[in-house]
């Protein structure tokens, strides 16, 4: 993987905006207030801030679980799950450059919303975290998360978002009851 390919300053501004919008959409969809537990239980990083093991080939992002503990806490009962959303700049930029119909802003919004759906499902125990990376997540679970992501984003009037839905059309299937 080409580790030299990172988001530039303008692209990072687009990432920041997509993070804000996706967080708001996630909070609204899952009926969480901005002050609830989710705010401090995850972080979003781009390639330049990732450790070597957090960079992967293939997916556009991955969620990695870490164990957090408050300062001066020695008991295991004081630990908590902390999730890091690791954006893979190179894969995202490559997909956008190779696919005429994809534009960075709506693509980032979809990716970030998708990853935050995973985080919420992990934190609410709707999905078990026992996988090392996104590629290990079961196909059924991945399709379920794409379905939820589509459900969250469909009513949002974002220019060129339909092209992103088209890009993911094989993943966005109706959820089985």
Which residues fall in each region the model found?
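Conserved binding/catalytic microenvironments
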Residues: 91-96, 135, 140, 161-165
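Long, well-structured alpha-helical subdomains associated
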Residues: 2-9, 16-20, 150, 154-177
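Short loop/turn segments at strand-loop or loop-helix junctions that form parts
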Residues: 86-92, 122
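Short coil-to-beta-strand
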Residues: 78-87, 115-116
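Post-HEXXH active-site segment of zinc metalloproteases
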Residues: 106-107, 121-151
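Catalytic glutamate of the conserved HExxH
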Residues: 111, 115-123
